[in-house]
Amino acid sequence: SGFVFGNNVNQDFSSFKIEDIKRSSDTNSYTFVRESASVKESKIISFQPENYFVEVKHIIRNLSSEVINSSSYSKIERNSLKPPGTEGAFFGDPANFAYLGPVFSTESDNYQKVNLGELEENDFKENSIKGWTAFLEHYFLTAIIPDQENINVFVGKKNKTNEKFSVGVVGRPIKIQPFEETSFSYSLYFGPKVQSELSKANQDLPLAVDYGFLYWIGQPMFLAMQFFYDMVGNWGWAIVLVTLLIKVILWPLSYVSYKSMGKMRQIQPQLKDLQERHSGDRQAMSQAMMKLYKDEKVNPALGCLPMLLQMPFFLAFYWVLIGTVELRYAPFMLSLIHI
């Protein structure tokens, strides 16, 4: 991160050198400085031991007698390789279900996936006042949350020189008057996809916890699981309780299915008799079966349809279980069994 300067600036910068270190019980700050004949740039990086946020502030001072044209920028890079441990059979590793790659949140789309293949073909560029960008992994992410009051340009591209992919933010153009200074700040998040932590940085950052296309079902399930965890203090039992809750909610559908299957079992002898009687005439057998269903008030579809209607709920719950970092290595019972 830093500043992009116009042609009127001497680009012969010294390398960043540490100038100051400040430590306290809640924040550790490190100040780095570099300068050229025209400008002096300071970078202040602040860490808080209790969370995963990094606050970065850049200060630029014009040392010349000319106006300097500049823009701020911040970016993160990665290669195209999958993180260690994500290779293997599709059904063998939950990480293979997770989206790994760049994400942008802007005013036009608060959660937009732009995979590495797309950046191979075309750069991403979009103006927005609010938003963030990140690289996602299965349980972790690295995100840039810029100033939310000015227009920024969110960018993503592949560097053809080093074959690395980058996402970042470029600030609006500014003019720095002679012997004056300006600054810009942004936040970084390096850590697990813990929704309660992500929401502290940006209201849309919890969307990085990706429960797939059934997010609208999965998110309430996670909130229910969080509620039960707060009650019992154990994620394993929270999963059991959510499973029971889902079964209770879906019981009317299950009841219809079980009732229909019970009726089908009762008329099995009659169906078998019809099949033997009309074994040589499929049309007659079909008509006889339809008449039997009507007389006995049996709908064969009611045995399968309610089960199909329940599938999205169980699929969404599966996505929640494999995508929630709080469950990673969490003890189930007496700390002897881990999820």
State the predicted function of each range.
Residues 1-207:
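Soluble non-transmembrane domains of integral membrane proteins
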Residues 58, 71-93, 147, 162-165, ...:
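Helix-loop-helix
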